[in-house]
Amino acid sequence: MRGVVWAARRRAGQQWPRSPGPGPGPPPPPPLLLLLLLLLGGASAQYSSDLCSWKGSGLTREAHSKEVEQVYLRCSAGSVEWMYPTGALIVNLRPNTFSPAQNLTVCIKPFRDSSGANIYLEKTGELRLLVRDVRGEPGQVQCFSLEQGGLFVEATPQQDISRRTTGFQYELMSGQRGLDLHVLSAPCRPCSDTEVLLAICTSDFVVRGFIEDVTHVPEQQVSVIHLRVSRLHRQKSRVFQPAPEDSGHWLGHVTTLLQCGVRPGHGEFLFTGHVHFGEAQLGCAPRFSDFQKMYRKAEERGINPCEINME
């Protein structure tokens, strides 16, 4: 819907975001003067019809137009799809419930074939690259605090007119629920006792079981861990399904970063984690015997944040 442009015009009065400092990375955005001309050339606001997802095309603009388009989405999850990208988008994400920005984490996952634009985190004129325009590379999940800034999507110069689409899914969640993805994006490390005890309260799934196999997928930089579950404490989205042999067990798989170097291990574990973008992602996974000790110790001291059946 065009016509509601006051917010965009306020933006147009600001300086264009500055490119990241020197160092390895993609070519910087065009010079400041050219970018200022882009802004002055026009800006428009777009409101999604369902407030969760937006789909647009650069072909709707005049050939010489280099607009900066404002997109406003007010939802906890959705997607952005931009066909034939030209110029730039500023994507404003807000939850559909009142929640302070400092308590919210935003995670984005590029579409598998996304191409035609770079995606930056932008705040007060500074740019930090999140997703580089490299066609054919699988998109990695990127997370940041909502108070760190918004999304600036800039089309890259193209030598042909073949169809290109830049797109991504997004999720907004409380800071605590987004913790697992931040842990996964950092060097892998075992969870502390406090993190494990909190994970059993806040995770989307909490199960007890064994690792049957691990499949490494280098092209996606992930490892898929196949589990046989003996005790289902909690799950969402039906990650684990009853085993076909009707043995009282459940089967399912979770993913973690390839760099974590997960290998099949003997013994029983407690697996926790969250479901993001339809995928179960591993959080804390202590050996069950170690978990029993830390849980009982916390229970004796009265500091366990929630209860779980240990039988």
Swiss-Prot record:
Subcellular location per the Swiss-Prot or TrEMBL entry: Secreted
GO CC, one annotated term: extracellular space
InterPro entries given in the database record: Meteorin-like
Name of this protein: Meteorin-like protein
Tissue expression notes: Abundantly expressed in adipose tissue.
Predominant location category: secreted
Domain of life: Eukaryota
Residue positions the entry lists as glycosylated: N103
Keywords: Disulfide bond, Glycoprotein, Hormone, Secreted, Signal
Record bears the keyword Cell membrane: no
Record-stated family: Belongs to the meteorin family.
Disulphide-bonded residues: C52-C75, C107-C143, C188-C260, C191-C284, C201-C306
Keyword Glycoprotein: yes
Biological-process GO terms, alphabetical: brown fat cell differentiation; energy homeostasis; fat cell differentiation; negative regulation of inflammatory response; positive regulation of brown fat cell differentiation; response to cold; response to muscle activity
GO function term, MF aspect, one: hormone activity
Function: Hormone induced following exercise or cold exposure that promotes energy expenditure. Induced either in the skeletal muscle after exercise or in adipose tissue following cold exposure and is present in the circulation. Able to stimulate energy expenditure associated with the browning of the white fat depots and improves glucose tolerance. Does not promote an increase in a thermogenic gene program via direct action on adipocytes, but acts by stimulating several immune cell subtypes to enter the adipose tissue and activate their prothermogenic actions.
Leader sequence segment: 1-45
